[in-house]
Swiss-Prot record:
Protein name stated in the entry: 33 kDa chaperonin
InterPro entries, per the entry: Heat_shock_Hsp33, Heat_shock_Hsp33_C, Heat_shock_Hsp33_N
Modification after translation (UniProt): Under oxidizing conditions two disulfide bonds are formed involving the reactive cysteines. Under reducing conditions zinc is bound to the reactive cysteines and the protein is inactive.
Predominant cellular place of this UniProt entry's protein: cytoplasm
UniProt-listed SUPFAM superfamilies: Hsp33 domain (SSF64397), HSP33 redox switch-like (SSF118352)
Amino acid sequence: MSDYLVKALAYDGQVRAYAARTTDTVSEAQRRHQTWPTASAALGRAITAGVMMGAMLKGDDKLTIKIDGGGPIGTILVDSNAKGEVRGYVTNPHVHFDLNEHGKLDVAKAVGKNGMLTVVKDLGLRDFFTGQVPIISGELGEDFTYYFASSEQVPSSVGVGVLVNPDNTILAAGGFIIQLMPGTEEKTIEQIEQRLQTIPPVSKMVESGLTPEEILEELLGKGNVKVLETLPVSFVCRCSRERIADAIISLGPQEIQDIMEKEGYAEASCHFCNETYHFTKEELEQLKQLAEAKN
């Protein structure tokens, strides 16, 4: 099964729901950044939430999530858009702790609870929406739940999970977002709350082979879910050699000349995907000429 997400309605439109399988996407992030298990779980949870939140956007809109809880993992940064494309990184990928008292990876300890979760939506035409809430648990699912309630005034339940193999590879990853529309009946809310208390962790559901549609049925009941759209999900970075070259050109002829004399080459890495771009002295000379032409 490839990664994808579903958008759905349930209970005759009273509930909006999203569910995603992100195992391959989180695996690609782990491979690129060589994250250790606890860092993999933290980054994977953020990526999973990010791609589902991106699916709430339209057209070319995009969003950035910044999680900075003051923990040893540093900052988690995730970019996503309305097309199911997501990328992300963590400042300190080599963070791992013993399992917590529940036998799970200790994401809260890695993330920390002394900081903020920030969401910036780029809605085009210089129209930005910024929402920011304090991190309340560091487990991230609860933090995104709090974000929706506090910043967007939408009662929600967010579940995100990642299972990591002993060799650091990703066994399973996925998540869901359940949102109550205005006027949701009390009976509906009670039924959903009961199901949320009894279902297995979302990562376990993905591991057992459940599709995003089936995960929503577990959450909301069979026959209640009306799928509106399915969307492929993947790790996509928009960096390129051309963009890095443009950045070097923008330094100006003199600074490029200094690099050529001191280093003899230039190397730049993209934070989001860890791709490294190398420019030889000859290539720098060409970029210097382009910079001179611009001046």
